[in-house]
């Protein structure tokens, strides 16, 4: 109804987008009723306020129509147990929202950690590639002059050149997240 693809959740809990958990029970009816427009949302809010006022008046007058019908019929006529008033419904919604906020923050932290790990891994691969390119260019045969017909008695040609640099290694990080990536992809560095 709001223009988004939705599927009905089991048990009629409301609409859920593909790949996302279903909406909290307290919001699903509001979203379906609003149709996505703010004017409709205002209308629903005023209707909810009117219902809250009626519930408050009914709670203050125990001899109202609900009480006259008898307590035996009250449970069967109401169907599934629902919150008695708007305050308890809001408290239940608040609890659900806190849980969703905690889940959201947890997922956000995990995504951020994964993003950082991917960036670290990219930099590590780039550094390794750069080191390998540099090492191969230093040790390639074309970078050294060929033997100029020297005899065994002459000084070796490497004596005039500086000694070979130590082999280049990628610095090892001490981050558990990087270790997890190396273990997960079985990369030997």
Swiss-Prot record:
LRR repeats lie at residues 86-114. One of its GO terms (cellular component) is lamellipodium. The modification Phosphoserine is found at residues 28, 188. Residues 68-79 have a biased composition (Low complexity). Residues 159-169 have a biased composition (Pro residues). The keyword ATP-binding does not apply. The keyword S-adenosyl-L-methionine does not apply. Its main location: cytoplasm. It is found in: Cytoplasm; Cell projection, Lamellipodium. GO terms for molecular function: transcription corepressor binding. Residues 55-81, 141-174 are annotated as: Disordered. InterPro entries: LURA1/LRA25. GO terms for biological process: establishment of cell polarity; negative regulation of SMAD protein signal transduction; negative regulation of transforming growth factor beta receptor signaling pathway; positive regulation of cell migration. Coiled coil: none annotated. Keywords: Cell projection, Cytoplasm, Leucine-rich repeat, Phosphoprotein, Receptor, Repeat. Belongs to the FAM89 family. Interacts with SKI. Interacts (via LRR repeat) with CDC42BPA (via AGC-kinase C-terminal domain) and CDC42BPB (via AGC-kinase C-terminal domain). Interacts (via LRR repeat) with LIMK1 (via LIM zinc-binding domains). Forms a tripartite complex with CDC42BPA, CDC42BPB and LIMK1. Negatively regulates TGF-beta-induced signaling; in cooperation with SKI prevents the translocation of SMAD2 from the nucleus to the cytoplasm in response to TGF-beta. Acts as an adapter that mediates the specific recognition of LIMK1 by CDC42BPA and CDC42BPB in the lamellipodia. LRAP25-mediated CDC42BPA/CDC42BPB targeting to LIMK1 and the lamellipodium results in LIMK1 activation and the subsequent phosphorylation of CFL1 which is important for lamellipodial F-actin regulation. This is Leucine repeat adapter protein 25. It comes from Rattus norvegicus (Rat). The gene is Fam89b.
């Amino acid at each position: 109804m709001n223009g988004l693809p939705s599927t009905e959740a089991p048990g009629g809990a409301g609409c859920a987008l593909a790949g996302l958990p279903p909406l909290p029970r307290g919001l699903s009816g509001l979203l379906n009723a609003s149709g996505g427009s703010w004017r409709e949302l205002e209308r629903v809010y005023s209707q909810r306020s009117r219902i809250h006022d009626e519930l408050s008046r009914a709670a203050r007058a125990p001899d109202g129509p609900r009480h006259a019908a008898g307590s035996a019929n009250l449970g069967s006529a109401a169907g599934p147990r629902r919150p008695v008033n708007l305050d308890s419904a809001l408290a239940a919604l608040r609890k659900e929202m806190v849980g969703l906020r905690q889940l959201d923050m947890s997922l956000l932290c995990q995504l951020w950690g994964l993003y950082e790990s991917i960036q670290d891994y990219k930099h590590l691969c780039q550094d390794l590639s750069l080191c390998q390119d540099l090492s191969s260019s230093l040790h390639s045969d074309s970078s050294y002059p060929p033997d100029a017909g020297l005899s065994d008695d002459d000084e070796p040609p490497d004596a005039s050149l500086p000694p070979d640099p130590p082999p280049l290694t990628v610095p090892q990080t001490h981050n558990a997240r990087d270790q997890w990536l190396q273990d997960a992809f079985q990369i030997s560095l």
